[in-house]
Each structure stands twice: as structure tokens, then as C-alpha cells.
Design a protein with these regions (language model features):
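SAM-dependent methyltransferase catalytic region
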Residues: 1, 6-8, 12-316
Length: 316
């Protein structure tokens, strides 16, 4: 595949080629401390995320080095050495396992995401192997800007003190597996349920000249976004945050269900995979993902689609 962009397009999309010597060096030293004192099985199950993956240069290098580290450590632990004639195939299997289960990536360029899928497959392909499916792992999006699992303290929504308003401070992250505070008066509210000064803010002189009356109405409307919330507002925000909590947990369970329905079992050197093989084609996996997870062409939206809609609406 040859992917060529003109200079300006390349600059606008931040599409730059990373030389192999650089990816090898950076990945080597990133893994050096991380892999210290880890068992082979721990190495095999490390997850890797590249927030600006491009066509997966760094992901491929991480897979290569993790696979080599796993086999080397497993040989030391078991005392069993893979024969030269089988080593390449066994290495490719380990690379396929890591790519299929533990690799995640995001990129602004949708074409780059498609190229990354092909690149990972070509890097991990082996005789008799399955075609990997990356729909739940490699996505087109912006990893820097957007709604997140972050909250503001309830007190920041009602204060009139300058510098203490929610929109003047960064929200607090709530890691998966931990709960936000829910006690009335001390609860935390998800940031994407709240207004922001940047909403409907137009500074373009041309637009101001074309629609002065509407711009004034929008300015007045914008002021309401950042006004302190009332007691009734807080009741609604607590309820909505509770619904978000439920949707998040349901989405996690749904994701696990999708992964179980689309998973391909793969045992590698020194590790027997106990996952149940889905025996599904790429097309069948796409249908499962579209209907069950994304709720496309379905009468009712599932938890992922509902949560995504709310977060996308805030971003827009």
C-alpha cells in the first residue's frame, strides 16, 4: 500500500512517517522498565494503547518486542526451547495473540485506521491463522478532545465566587472500577451534562455581520450555560448522572459480550487459551458489532449508543 498526501494535507492531518529505527528505540526503552520482574504470562497480557496510531508503526513494533520478550521469558520459566524450524511460526502466533487481544489505537484519519488494521494483520499473519478483527480495538476519533469519564463537585455548580466555577477548573477523572461521590450536597456530576462558555460562541466577523440579531440571541443564551445551577437543576443532574453510571456499567458488560461472540481462540507456546472460539466470519462479526453494540438499524438504542449520543451532543 502506498499512502501519499500533499504537504499541506499531511500537515493538517499530522500524518508523518516514523522511521523504523526510531520506533524500535522508543519502544525498547519504554518496555525496558515495564517488563522488569514480569512473568511470561504477565507480558502476554499487557495492553497497549496508541492515542495517535497512524498506520500502526508503534503498535507493530510493540507487538514485535513483546512477543520476543514473552517467548524468551517462557523458555526460561519452562526450560523448553523452541526449535529453529518452529520458532518463526510460534513467534507469529504470539504476535497474533497480542494484536488480537491486547492492542488498542485511535487516529483522526479514517484511512489510517484501515491501513493500521491491514498492517497489523500482515505483521502477525501465520500459516493456518485466522484473520484478526479490530472493530472494538482500532477506532477513528480524537483522543485529545472530547467528553470523558470526568466529574465536577456539586459545590462548583452553585458557587458565585470567581475562580471556583466548574468551567474555570479542570474536572476530576473517575477511573473505571471506582465510583463517583453520590451523597446529596457532596455528589459529583459528569462534566458532559453541564454547560460551557465555549458553546455556541461565534467570533467570526463575517457571521456577525450576516446575522447580528441571531448572534445577540445566542450570546444571551450562552450566558445561561454558565449561570449557577438551581436546587431543581441539581436534582435533575444527580438523576442524570445516576443514569450515566448505569449506562456505563451496562456498556462494559455489553462490550464483554460482543468480545465473547467475536473472539477467536488461540493457544500459543506455553499458554493454553481457555476462550471459547466464536467460529464467526469477519462479516458476521461486523453484523454483531453493528447491531448489538452500536445499535444500528435497531428499534431501541443500547447503552453504548445512548451514552455516545449524549457525549457526542455535548462535544458538538
Amino acid at each position: 500500500f502506498i499512502y501519499r498526501l500533499a504537504g499541506r494535507e499531511r500537515e493538517k492531518s499530522a500524518s508523518y512517517y516514523t522511521p523504523e529505527v526510531l520506533t524500535k528505540c522508543l519502544v525498547k526503552y519504554a518496555l525496558k522498565e515495564l517488563l522488569k520482574d514480569k512473568t511470561a504470562d504477565e507480558i502476554l497480557h499487557l495492553t497497549v494503547c496508541e492515542p495517535a496510531m497512524g498506520s500502526a508503526a508503534f503498535l507493530n513494533e510493540a507487538i514485535n518486542q513483546l512477543a520476543e520478550a514473552y517467548i524468551s521469558q517462557k523458555e526460561q520459566e519452562t526450560g523448553e526451547i523452541i526449535g529453529y524450524e518452529n520458532r518463526f511460526n510460534e513467534l507469529q502466533k504470539v504476535k497474533m495473540y497480542i494484536a488480537d487481544r491486547n492492542v488498542y489505537g485511535v487516529d483522526l484519519n479514517s484511512i489510517a485506521v484501515e491501513l493500521a488494521e491491514v498492517s497489523l494483520w500482515l505483521n502477525t499473519i501465520y500459516e493456518g491463522g485466522f484473520v484478526p478483527w479490530f472493530n472494538t480495538q482500532l477506532v477513528n476519533g480524537n483522543s485529545l478532545i472530547g467528553a470523558r469519564r470526568q466529574v465536577y463537585a456539586e459545590s462548583a455548580l452553585t458557587t458565585t465566587s470567581k475562580g471556583l466555577h466548574w468551567y474555570e477548573n479542570a474536572p476530576e477523572r473517575v477511573p473505571l472500577g471506582t465510583e463517583r461521590k453520590k451523597k446529596t450536597g457532596y455528589s459529583q456530576i459528569y462534566h458532559f451534562l453541564l454547560g460551557d462558555p465555549g458553546m455556541c460562541s461565534y467570533t467570526d466577523k463575517v457571521i456577525k455581520g450576516l446575522e447580528p440579531d441571531n448572534i445577540k440571541k445566542m450570546k444571551d443564551w450562552n450566558k445561561k450555560f454558565t449561570a449557577p445551577y438551581s436546587t431543581d437543576d441539581l436534582v435533575s443532574l444527580r438523576r442524570l448522572s445516576g443514569i450515566v453510571d448505569d449506562l456505563w456499567q451496562s456498556q462494559i458488560a455489553l462490550r464483554k459480550e460482543v468480545e465473547e461472540k467475536t473472539q477467536d481462540a488461540l493457544s500459543v507456546f506455553g499458554y493454553a487459551d481457555n476462550a471459547e472460539d466464536s467460529h464467526t466470519t469477519i462479516r458476521q462479526k461486523d453484523k454483531i458489532y453493528s447491531a448489538l453494540y452500536k445499535s444500528e438499524h435497531m428499534r431501541n438504542a443500547g447503552p453504548y449508543a445512548r451514552l455516545k449520543f449524549a457525549m457526542d451532543y455535548w462535544c458538538s
